[in-house]
Curated annotation (Swiss-Prot):
Gene3D superfamilies: Vaccinia Virus protein VP39
EC number(s) on file: 2.5.1.-
UniProt protein name: tRNA U34 carboxymethyltransferase
Its biological purpose: Catalyzes carboxymethyl transfer from carboxy-S-adenosyl-L-methionine (Cx-SAM) to 5-hydroxyuridine (ho5U) to form 5-carboxymethoxyuridine (cmo5U) at position 34 in tRNAs.
Provenance organism: Hamiltonella defensa subsp. Acyrthosiphon pisum (strain 5AT)
Keywords for this protein: Transferase, tRNA processing
Oligomer status and interactors: Homotetramer.
Family from the record: Belongs to the class I-like SAM-binding methyltransferase superfamily. CmoB family.
């Protein structure tokens, strides 16, 4: 598959090379399956229709911004913008690409700002982001100095959004999304840092997820875990009966104390809570790039401390831990 040709070259002669035994057939099967969907075919055509641009200015450290001198023509800019809008909704961002500002639903830079002070240095490191959505944070990881940033994300639209951005930032940049689930990827125990952000509460078995993350880390590697939490002691967890904030696939929202117990149960050490933040409408909101319901629609209109179902409104915790 041409979408992964660079990636296959990157993982030769390093611990990830064992993936070459399984990934090519897995990704070929994924492509054949996903392109049976007319929407996915349209997304692929949209990405293929984008020009390959090499920016003369690229900032991945403070934001994701690409520009070129002299600037692209107004007609080319409009054509790119129309193609990017054909990949809506954009839930993660923002991106500034040749004068086009993708104002995504989530201001993912806010999360990155909270996480960054607590990271081990990423300079020259190999990092994995599990459930990476459209790869926004992969680019920020490269900006922080990572040598290789790999994301795992099974949702097709997110993959095509990533490929669109990659085409506009530069194909040689060492970031890649694998459109698979983490349980379908062989453990390599080789990543310096593994991220799981906004995933744990979607998993029916949170302990299995933590073990999957651990099995990708090298010894002494850092785990960064960001997830929904509730107040309570080390025995308290919220299991929504039907929906949480209009999401059907939320299974498990633990207290911070219980999350700490889980991490230690799975063998992680030096577990630290580094941030707890209430999700705000400044960070998650409806925009012209994501026009359907957003956080404000998920909260009780009379009491924003509760979801529409009456549960505690979203609070997100960030914990770090290490594999022995």
């Amino acid at each position: 598959m041409t979408e992964f040709s660079h990636f296959y070259q990157w993982i030769v002669n390093n611990p990830f090379e064992i993936w070459l035994n399984t990934l090519p057939s897995q990704l070929t099967a994924w492509r054949l399956s996903v392109l049976k969907n007319p929407k996915a075919k349209a997304w692929l055509n949209t990405v293929q229709g984008l020009p390959e641009l090499l920016p003369s200015y690229l900032n991945l450290l403070d934001r994701i911004q690409a520009d070129i001198s002299p600037p692209i023509s107004e007609s080319l800019q409009k054509g790119i913008e129309n193609r990017l809008k054909a990949l809506m909704p954009w839930r993660k961002g923002p991106f500034s690409l040749y004068g086009i500002h993708i104002d995504s639903e989530w201001r993912s830079n806010c999360k990155w700002k909270r996480i960054l002070p607590h990271l081990d240095s990423l300079v020259g490191k190999k990092v994995l982001d599990v459930g990476c959505a459209n790869g926004y944070h992969l680019w920020r990881m490269l900006g922080a100095g990572a040598r290789l940033a790999i994301g795992v994300e099974p949702m097709p639209l997110f993959f095509f959004q990533f490929m669109a951005v990659k085409k506009l930032l530069g194909e040689a940049l060492k970031a890649q999304i694998l459109p698979l689930r983490i349980e379908n990827i062989a453990p390599v125990e080789a990543f310096d840092t593994v991220f799981s952000m906004g995933v744990l509460y979607h998993r029916r078995s949170p302990l299995d997820h933590l073990y999957q993350l651990k099995n990708q880390l090298r010894s002494s590697g850092q785990l960064v875990l960001e997830t929904l939490v509730i107040d309570g002691n080390d025995q308290q967890v919220l299991i929504p009966e039907k929906e949480y904030a209009k999401m059907r696939n939320v299974y498990f929202i633990p207290s911070v104390s219980l999350l700490n117990v889980f991490l230690k149960k799975c063998g992680f050490i030096d577990v630290r809570l580094v941030d707890v933040t209430a999700t705000s409408t400044d960070e998650q909101r409806r925009t012209c790039w994501m026009t359907s319901e957003s956080l404000l629609d998920f909260l009780d209109p009379e009491d924003h401390s509760k979801t529409i179902e009456g549960y505690p409104a979203p609070f997100r915790a960030i914990l770090t831990a290490y594999k022995p």
